[in-house]
């Protein structure tokens, strides 16, 4: 999965997919009442990027729905996965469940079109704080109570705080989450970060009793770092330059071993050689 980083304006969906992304990451900010409000990152952000592009969240969802609904004039067949980077640090811990409920309602209405031929992309809810795990339960409860538990088949999870792998495992246990787990690791492109924790995450993914299904590394803009991440065995790379990742995947060393994921590749299934 080549994951376009910080895609917060509808116009950027086309831009990143046309550069080679089959997945995008979108920032979601919340208001004081835990309503998802804007797709917005703000300052500071990655080096070389404009930090202030934004849409109202529900409007972004409608644009995203068009981009992922077969037959729509804006449809991109290869856009198959969307990571919502949920900026919950503005909320109190006890608002996490409400944030999940309100997020589910927004997605149900504006993205899934109330279950009637909505967008088809898989969705990862990426949460920065382990203490906010009840966002996942609030989300699930709402889809169930609104009569669409089947949409949970399209939903996965990530805790993005670079926490100890063991602590993340415990948190999923508390949340009652088994499966559909992505594990992110990374840092802004302005700084360097080693691959030690990525290797631990990959080892967990490949063990018989691990909780992780997929591992992705962010934010990678350089060819050398891309190669290092691929050598470590990641499933996804988040980037500001999808074309750079696509170029490296075309190199003879990687062409035989990796390919770009399509809609038929289940993002919740651990890949077995």
UniProtKB/Swiss-Prot annotation:
- Cofactor(s) the protein requires to work: Mg(2+)
Task: Locate the active site.
Answer: 5, 41 (nucleophile)
Q: Which residues does the record list as glycosylated?
A: 250
| UniProt entry tagged with the keyword Glycoprotein | yes
Chief localization: secreted
Subcellular location, record wording:
Secreted
Free-text cofactor note: Binds 1 Mg(2+) ion per subunit.
User: Which reaction does this chain catalyze?
Assistant: an N-(acyl)-sphingosylphosphocholine = an N-(acyl)-sphingosyl-1,3-cyclic phosphate + choline; an N-(acyl)-sphingosylphosphoethanolamine = an N-(acyl)-sphingosyl-1,3-cyclic phosphate + ethanolamine; a 1-acyl-sn-glycero-3-phosphocholine = a 1-acyl-sn-glycero-2,3-cyclic phosphate + choline; a 1-acyl-sn-glycero-3-phosphoethanolamine = a 1-acyl-sn-glycero-2,3-cyclic phosphate + ethanolamine
This chain belongs to which protein, by name?
Dermonecrotic toxin LdSicTox-alphaIB1av
**Which organism encodes this protein?**
Loxosceles deserta
